[in-house]
Amino acid sequence: MKKSILLFFITFLVISCSSDRDYLPEDFWGMKLKRKLTGNEAKDFVDKLHFQNVATEKNEVGFYTGEIGNATIYITYYTDEKTAYQDFRKMTEKISPENSMFVRGTYHNINNKQLYSCMGLGQVHYVFAHQNLLFWISVDPHFSRNFLDEYMKLVMN
């Protein structure tokens, strides 16, 4: 009996530690993942958006499309939670001034998570850190909040 419990516990730990969550699923909220960038391709894409080197070594970008509209999810991986949160603060402070292409920037507390939202380029943008990850979600305005709520459930659970 003790061996069975120990074997179950070890198996559970191995599965839990080895499973990587897919933050860019093939289908999400009625939309299809049309393109996924990883590795150097994702890093180069993020750097080109900023006209300078800003991306960490590990990034992912997912482009979603469906009948309802479009969304893009940018994910940056950090070595620890503290660095992810520091970059969240740094990034949101940099885009907060009304002289940037982003307007109406506001901090919120949604689902017990500090989040920043703003408007720009015809979309609503949400930025938040979770564990060692930094997320930037750009989504069409007419379904942005519902999309965010569902995506946060995916990330937090």
Name the predicted role of every residue range.
Residues 21-31:
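Short, low-complexity, disordered segments immediately C-terminal to signal peptides
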